[in-house]
Each structure stands twice: as structure tokens, then as C-alpha cells.
Amino acid sequence: MQPQEVDLMENSTMRNGARVLPPEAISKRHIGPYIIRETLGEGSFGKVKLATHYKTQQKVALKFISRQLLKKSDMHMRVEREISYLKLLRHPHIIKLYDVITTPTDIVMVIEYAGGELFDYIVEKKRMTEDEGRRFFQQIICAIEYCHRHKIVHRDLKPENLLLDDNLNVKIADFGLSNIMTDGNFLKTSCGSPNYAAPEVINGKLYAGPEVDVWSCGIVLYVMLVGRLPFDDEFIPNLFKKVNSCVYVMPDFLSPGAQSLIRRMIVADPMQRITIQEIRRDPWFNVNLPDYLRPMEEVQGSYADSRIVSKLGEAMGFSEDYIVEALRSDENNEVKEAYNLLHENQVIQEKSHLSKSKRVDSFLSVSPPAFSEYTSELQKKSKQELIDPTLEGPRWTVSDPPTYAKQTIDSNICVLVPTAEKNKLEMRTLADAASAVDTSQSTRKKSRRNKWHFGVRCRGDAPEILLAVYRALQRAGAQFTVPKPVNGKYRSDMYTIKSRWEIPHCKREGKNTYAYIELQLYEVMPGCFMLDVKSNGYKDIYSHPERTADHGMDDLKSSFPFLDLCAMLVCKLFSA
């Protein structure tokens, strides 16, 4: 039975950026104005279904996320925050999140539908010409650059996650929820797809960052142009050895430009690997680069654009007065970040209208585009050292301020916090942390360009380092459990510390809010360790147990308490 010819969204309400539908707008066969056609797949937290708009017949994908399973996994607050952010991402080569609908049982993400996969296209074509492969590669790199600029790293790029629309344009998928929920502890349990994963990821030494996406893009480019994987073995340990050795065959039929670019991307040492910005300047990459994908100049606005403020309020559930007040604040906040994102989206949209490329003029829509009978001929074809103080215990070092600093969110993607580079969005907490050390050495001339570095580096014995970390946590007011030996032996994961920290300004009568963090100590090389801090979300602890069942989605959590704790922890480590 098809929904009646009425506005099924008329009685819906908005809560924290998600649309709440009345019961009459939900059934087994439709969700609001979308008629469910078939199930496309099933994951750990629900199904993905194909649906069409009942008026326009436009296809969309509905991703169902079970609220009960989210509550059991203690992930729902992070999911809500991530959804509200992802709704703002608009790029012609990233799958769009059109809307979020909540029902009593599920969170339903309405996302752009793209029916093809680059994987299937490669299988059918065997290998592509350089012009064809370069076109796909340009779209992938520009989309990845857009996400890195807005603090999102994919970390699981592979042809299966690179979808193709009817016009054979790339649409990068799985930037968000499915990966957040299924990956848990990324470095402990998974390395994404082994054939496309960088050596630092499969070895579990460091938290994955932008260099990982560059490696994966290099593998994808190789596969498109050569028709096979550079590293492949059915026996996983052998595959890991091949990836770590970084020895692969470069075919003679590739042009010198393509060979040079691939060799600079597929480099085992992430410090020596080419960056996205360097790829952007590569001559081979820039051949026939469409106008809408060319780098744009930053536009510094002196006032708040009312159109952007309105969109921001709708997407994040904030009042316009609150948004304007946040924008006027001298301190950085999530509203400013989201505003900058929407502002860039607007600039991209204006550029896209001037492009000669087909079908790039509607990618910023906040709802599925109207049905079009347009058919392209293409669819008919086969498809980052400041100081090194000597402490009584281990020696700690903080890396030079990189292009970005990292905040992880227990997922296949990670959210990054930008530095003050180009006067953009300087984080006060990071500045406070930097002021705790002697910055006189930070201005020394570096022999190497800025890179991505994560965590806090230290030298010494692992037990001494762990003791220093526990002491720093104690001085910071965090709570933790000290590991105790069982039958004279310590648990195997003693290098992982789980802790929580009460957020002072979130304290209310009968309720305390805690930020949960996880610290992991990695051995980068003999005698050299890296301490990584990961956010495990936030949780409200009630003084009245019966209130714990009230676990709704009304409180929107920010990442700033986690960042404050990170800055405090670094200061305590250096003041030890």
C-alpha cells in the first residue's frame, strides 16, 4: 500500500537535528515519504534498505540503526553527535546524508543511493587507461582532501567503499556510522582491509591518520591502472610481510608520471609518504582536472551569513541566537567549526555551477534531488620535537605543531582538531598544553616538512612510563583502576589504561557527567614509545539509580571536555 498523497513530514518534529515521525508515518513498507523496496544488506546494528520517494520515485538508501543495540553498546551519544556533523558534509564525490529520522526502535539515516561499485567496474575492465583511472583518482583525492580539511579521516578506503553513480562518478561511502559501530577498538581488532591497509596500521603501532588514506589511495590507483593488487597473499601473515617490505612490481607500460606518483604514495615510512597537498600539485594528477575540483582560495568572512546560520540551526538543532553568540565568541567551539564547513560548502556550490562537468550542480541539496530523466551516455558503458626534558622517569616529547592534531573517536573514521595554521580555529586547550613546555625550540628550522604525528612520544622503560601516566591521571583528577596480578601474572593488555574524568561544568543536581578515555602505549621502536589517548564517549551517572533508564537523546555532547582532559594530561606529564 502506497502512502497517501499528503505531506507525511507535516507532523514531524526536530530533535537535535533528527526528525521524529509520528506513528502514522511509519510502517513496515514505508518510513515517512519513502517506500521501502528491498533489503540491500545487513550489519551489526541493523539493515540497509533501498527505498524510493513516493512522489518523485528518487532512489535513496535507508540505513536502520537499532536504538536498543546502541544503548547496550553505550554508543548512542557519539552516534547522535556524529550524525549531526555528517549531515553538513557536502561534496560531489561523497555519499550524502540527506536526513535522519528517529522511530521508537531505530535511527534511520536517509542517504544517497549509488548502485555501482568501483570494485565491480575494475573486475569488468581488467585495467583502465591512464585517462580513465586518473578521472576516478582525481575525484577520490579531492573528496579525501575535503574530509581531511574538516577533520575526518576514512581509514578504510578500498574499491568496495568507492561507489559509482549512474554517470560513473565516484561516491565515497562508509565515512560514518557503520564503521564507528562495527570497529570498536580499531588498532586492537582490525586493520580495515589488509590489502589496502598501511604498514603502520597492520602493525598496530600508531593510530591511523591522513597518511593511511594516502597509502590506500595509492593502492587503489595501482589497482585501477595495473589491474591487480601490489600486495596479495591468501595467507594473512605472508600478506603482512609483503606490505611491510613494500616491495612490489611496477609495470613498464605505466607512464613515468604515473609510476612516480604511485612510488611516492606507496611508501612504508609514513614520514616519507607524499601528502594530499603534494598529490594536488603533481603534474600527472593535474592533467584534465575539472574546474570544480581545482583548489579554492579561502574566503574570510567578517559577518555571519544568515543563510548559513539558518542551515546550521536546522542541522544541529540550535537556535539562531545561540549560533550567533557562539560565532561572536573569541574561543573556538563546535558551532564555529560547523559554520566554516557550511561556508566552504557554499563556495564549492558556487564553483560547481560554473563547471562544464555534468551532474555536479545538485550535490549540496539537503534532500534527495527531484527525479530526472537525464541519462548520461557513460552509464551505458561497462562500469606531524618541541623539547626533550630529562625527567626522573621516562623522557617525554611533544611533536611539532602539525597540520592537524588528532582526536580519535573509536571508529574507522577519526575526527581531527586543526591547529592555528592560517589563523584557523586555534584550540585554546592545545595552546595551554604548549605553554607548559619550552617553546624556544619549536621555532628551530626543520629539515623536513610538517607531517602528521599523534600522541605523546617518550623514551624509557615501559613500567616507568606507565607509572608516570598513572600519576599524571591522578593529579588530573581522573579515576582509574590499577591493574592487579592474577596468579602472579598481569593481564596481557596492561599497556591499555581505561579511565574516566568528571566534567565540572556539566554537573547538575542528581547527575554527574563523565568523559571516558582509553590510553594505549605503543612501542614505535626499541626503547621508544608513543602514548595515544582515545575518547570512549560520555556517560551520565545518576545519584538515583532509577533514573538511569532515562537514557534519551536530549543532551548533545561536545568533544571539548575530552580535549581539555588531553591538554591537562600533557601538562601533568611535563610537570612531573
Swiss-Prot record:
Write out the catalytic residues in the record. Answer: D156
Q: How is it modified after translation?
A: Phosphorylation at Thr-189 by ssp1 is required for nuclear entry in nutritionally stressed cells.
Q: Which reaction does it catalyse?
A: L-seryl-[protein] + ATP = O-phospho-L-seryl-[protein] + ADP + H(+); L-threonyl-[protein] + ATP = O-phospho-L-threonyl-[protein] + ADP + H(+)
Task: List locations, semicolon-separated.
Answer: Cytoplasm; Nucleus
Q: Which residues form a coiled coil?
A: none
Question: A single Pfam family, by name?
Answer: Pkinase
Q: Residues annotated as region Auto-inhibitory domain (AID)?
A: 292-348
PTM annotation (Phosphoserine): residues: S442
GO terms for cellular component: cytoplasm; cytosol; mitotic spindle pole body; nucleotide-activated protein kinase complex; nucleus
Q: Name one GO biological process term.
A: positive regulation of cell cycle switching, mitotic to meiotic cell cycle
CDD domains of this UniProt entry?
AMPKA_C, STKc_AMPK_alpha, UBA_SNF1_fungi
The segment(s) forming the UBA domain are 304-345
Q: Which UniProt keywords apply?
A: ATP-binding, Carbohydrate metabolism, Cytoplasm, Kinase, Nucleotide-binding, Nucleus, Phosphoprotein, Serine/threonine-protein kinase, Transferase
The record ties this protein, via SMART domains, to: S_TKc
Entry annotated with the keyword Cytoplasm: yes
Any stretches that span the bilayer, and where are they? none
Q: Does the keyword ATP-binding apply?
A: yes
Comment text on domains:
The regulatory domain (RS) also called auto-inhibitory domain (AID) inhibits kinase activity of the protein kinase domain (KD).
Quaternary state and interactors? Component of the AMP-activated protein kinase complex also known as the SNF1 kinase complex (Snf1c), a heterotrimeric complex composed of a catalytic subunit alpha and 2 regulatory subunits beta (amk2) and gamma (cbs2).
According to its UniProt entry, the function of this protein is described as:
Serine/threonine protein kinase essential for release from glucose repression via the phosphorylation of scr1 upon glucose deprivation. Catalytic subunit of the AMP-activated protein kinase complex also known as the SNF1 kinase complex (Snf1c), a central regulator of cellular energy homeostasis, which, in response to a fall in intracellular ATP levels, activates energy-producing pathways and inhibits energy-consuming processes.
UniProt protein name: SNF1-like protein kinase ssp2
